[in-house]
Regions:
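Short alpha-helical transmembrane segments in multi-pass integral membrane proteins
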Residues: 1-23, 81-148, 190-245, 303-368, ...
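Short runs within selected transmembrane alpha-helices of multi-pass transporters and secretion channels
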Residues: 74, 143-161, 169-177, 198-211, ...
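Interfacial/gating helices of multi-pass transporter permease domains
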Residues: 42-64, 131-135, 195-196, 236-244, ...
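Helix-terminus/linker motif at the lipid-water interface of multi-pass membrane proteins
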Residues: 29, 33-53, 123-130, 186-192, ...
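Hydrophobic/aromatic residues in alpha-helical transmembrane segments
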Residues: 22, 38, 77, 118-119, ...
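Transmembrane helical elements of multi-pass membrane transporters/channels
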Residues: 19-38, 142, 176, 205-209, ...
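Small-residue-rich hydrophobic transmembrane alpha-helices
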Residues: 53-113, 150-169, 263, 277-341, ...
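N-terminal transmembrane alpha-helices
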Residues: 8-48, 61-76, 80, 105-112, ...
Length: 457
């Protein structure tokens, strides 16, 4: 630990950035594969690929809500457990973990019951048509029955990470992703199960990951053990955890609201093909944003440590290294999408009509995709510098203040209303990127003014 601290304060910034960013980047890429592999296989189902992909895409709002509830307990409980560990109060840390596990299991029962029976009506509301609804229901109901595994994996894996077992935590995702990738073609094409096979593959992969987590947290290697005696809910233990997790819950649940806003509007103005295109666009957007998150996760400890040590020259170097990588990646990826939109659309479906429509939509929806690198790198840097509230506000600025209202406002000013809905994304992207970047550099300049009074190495 001492050597790590010395390296963080004196070692090569670029080398340290690479050492810390690569594992985080690998984890994000694995997560990305987990998220989009089902859609790639489904989109290439013979004859029904386009309709099936559209139907499965309509399940996204429910999936995001399940994720949000997992984060409520996981993202709120893990930091509290870490604090208790730092205070040498292992018993309290284990009690926190046990209480969070109980909440996740209670949520699993409630969400499974509510969403299983309500999903046909919800999917209709989200924009499902007679052609896409059967595929949406087929995938959704199987996935929902496996919610207990999903909540376990997303919520409890954070307690492995917070103990310092980063590799074990990463393996949780890798194991699930590999099983999902292997099972998808076997069940979908080998056994002819189609969409149902994709859902079963996802649930089985999550189940294996859940067993992996529980075996670790009840085994000999873990620092904190999951014990039955700690699963009885204690208000003084669980309420602070849920209070801390509410910001993560809000961030993820707003993604659900955003998805509903897009699909309901596009269903109304563009029909199934527009909703299907949105499913592909969401996946392509993840190809942009998730690697950026990995880079920023690697840069965060380096920026935070040197900021705390008042080594502002190293903070500056670390930030601009992160900023440069993020902007370069998004610019190159954006240029490739603008030049070869049909190629990117074709990755997700073999439906010719959907490919052509999606290729057109890519050039509208991602017209300002290059700006995402600016926004995410600056927003995450705010977080690394301890400015969590500003970081949260900047994230909500794009989604809640700009994008969601624009989805409903812009169609009033254009004859092609589906075009107007897609246009909301680049408008929100460029405005949010400009505001976030300007605010960060103003903050950064103020920080630089304090440099004269600080000792730098």
């Amino acid at each position: 630990m001492a050597n790590m601290k010395r390296d963080m304060g004196t070692g090569s910034v670029k080398k340290l950035m690479a050492q810390m960013a690569v594992p985080a980047l690998v984890g994000q890429v694995v997560n990305l594969l987990y998220n989009i592999v089902d859609r790639i296989y489904i989109g290439h189902l013979p004859e029904i690929g386009g309709a099936a992909l559209t139907g499965v895409g309509l399940f996204t709002p429910i999936l995001m809500l399940i994720t949000a509830f997992a984060m409520l307990a996981g993202a709120g409980g893990a930091p509290r457990a870490a604090i208790a560990m730092g205070q040498k109060n292992k018993e309290k840390a284990e009690q926190i973990m046990g209480n969070c596990f109980s909440v996740l299991m209670i949520l699993a029962v409630i969400l499974t019951g509510v969403f299983y029976f309500a999903c046909p009506d919800l999917l209709r509301w989200f924009g499902a048509s007679d052609a896409t609804l059967p595929y949406a229901i087929e995938y959704a109901q199987i996935y929902i029955l496996g919610s207990v595994f999903v909540l376990n994996v997303m919520g409890m894996n954070t307690f492995i990470t917070t103990q310092g077992f980063a590799k074990i935590s990463m393996l949780t995702t890798v194991i699930g992703a590999v099983i999902n990738i292997v099972l998808d073609p076997i069940l979908m094409f080998g056994f002819g199960m189609g969409v149902k096979g994709a859902a079963i593959a996802t649930v089985l992969s999550q189940a294996v990951s859940a067993v992996w987590i529980l075996r670790f947290l009840t085994g000999k290697q873990t620092i904190l053990k999951l014990r039955l005696k700690n699963m009885r809910l204690v208000p003084s233990i669980i309420l602070p955890c849920l209070g801390l997790g509410i910001s993560s819950f809000i961030m993820v649940s707003t993604e659900s609201v955003l998805s509903i806003s897009f699909t309901t509007s596009l269903s109304r103005f563009g029909g199934d093909v527009a909703v299907g295109a949105m499913t592909v666009l969401t996946s392509i957007n993840q190809l942009i944003t998730m690697p950026l998150s990995g880079v920023c996760q690697g840069g965060q400890p380096l920026i935070s440590y040197n900021y705390g040590a008042k080594k502002y020259a190293r903070v500056k170097e670390a930030f601009f290294c992160q900023f440069g990588v993020c902007v370069a990646y998004t610019t190159v990826f954006w240029a490739a999408m603008m030049i070869f939109p049909n190629f990117f659309a074709g990755i997700f479906t073999s439906d010719t009509g959907l490919v052509e429509y999606t290729a057109w939509a890519i050039r509208v929806f991602l017209a300002c995709g290059f700006s995402v690198g600016f926004q995410i790198s600056c927003q995450q840097a705010f977080m690394a510098l301890g400015q969590a509230k500003i970081s949260l506000i900047m994230a909500l600025l794009r989604k809640v203040i700009l994008l969601i209202p624009l989805i409903f406002i812009l169609p009033n000013f254009f004859a092609d209303k589906a075009f107007a809905v897609f246009l909301a994304e680049p408008v929100a992207d460029i405005v949010a990127a400009a505001v976030t970047t300007i605010m960060f550099f103003r903050f950064f300049m103020k920080m630089q003014k304090t440099r004269n009074g600080a000792t730098n190495e």
